[in-house]
Amino acid sequence: MKDGWTITHDPLRIRLARGKNLFVDLGAERLLAAEKGTEKIAVEIKSFTRPSDMKDLEEAVGQFVVYNHLLRRYYPEYKLFLAVSENTCKTVFEEEAGQTLIEDGIIQLFSFDPNQEVIVRWLP
């Protein structure tokens, strides 16, 4: 992942009680020029390959919500982002269902170009 980020965990493991684990695809950080310290993010990458992009969306959001709540509890320094290709961003997250999730703050998202491995845009 480019754009000034360094991968720190591949995957980022969330250790739960009783030996259970969840794995977020990536943990990353970057140095902040304007302030001391680092910014840390966790990234869950989704492909949206099913015939129904709404089914993919339901699954991705459910997983995002679970991971987000557990990260807040166990790794509060990380902010979780869903990462999708720019094409998926246009076909799913610029439509009503995806826009509602972003506008209501349910998910944080960025799109990337899978060929060049660069972040295209961040959506709040």
Which residues does each predicted region cover?
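Nucleic-acid nuclease catalytic cores
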Residues: 57, 69-105, 112-114
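Metal-dependent nuclease catalytic cores in nucleic-acid-processing enzymes
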Residues: 1, 63-73
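Short aromatic/hydrophobic-glycine micro-motifs
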Residues: 4-6, 106-107
